[in-house]
């Protein structure tokens, strides 16, 4: 199964890479590897991850970094709505649900 980013989620992902790389050279690369491993698991079995508070929105946690990938499946494509840090305000991304509708 393929995936696509909501533009704001793509920005969150890129910001996270830059943040970790600025803290320690190579840590951003580690984050990318962990993120990609999570997406491989999500794309292989998207419905196996728990539902978030919203209907049809799933949450997959990165194992090493404090982030969740919030997504839904529409037309056989995983739509990534947010790459959310665990300490960020819950639900800040909810406005993206309608914007990302297809």
Could you tell me what each predicted segment is?
Residues 1-34:
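Arg/Lys-rich, positively charged N-terminal/basic patches that mediate binding to nucleic acids
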Residues 19, 55, 59-60, 83-85:
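General helical secondary-structure elements
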Residues 20, 42-43:
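Hydrophobic residues in alpha-helical segments
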Residues 24, 46-53, 88-91:
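Short, charge-rich, low-complexity interaction segments located
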Residues 37, 44-78:
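Basic/aromatic recognition patch in beta-strand/loop cores that engages polyanionic ligands
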Residues 41-42, 97:
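Low-complexity, flexible helical/coil segments
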Residues 72-102:
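Enriched for short, Lys/Arg-rich terminal
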């Amino acid at each position: 199964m393929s995936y696509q980013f909501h533009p704001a989620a793509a920005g969150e992902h890129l910001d996270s890479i830059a943040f970790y790389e600025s803290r320690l050279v190579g840590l951003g690369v580690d984050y990318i590897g962990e993120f990609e491993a999570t997406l491989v698991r999500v794309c292989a079995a998207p419905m196996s991850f728990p539902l978030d508070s919203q209907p049809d929105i799933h949450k997959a946690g990165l194992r090493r970094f404090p982030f969740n990938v919030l997504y839904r499946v529409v037309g056989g494509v995983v739509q990534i709505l947010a790459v959310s840090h665990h300490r960020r305000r819950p639900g800040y991304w909810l406005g993206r649900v309608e914007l990302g509708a297809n």
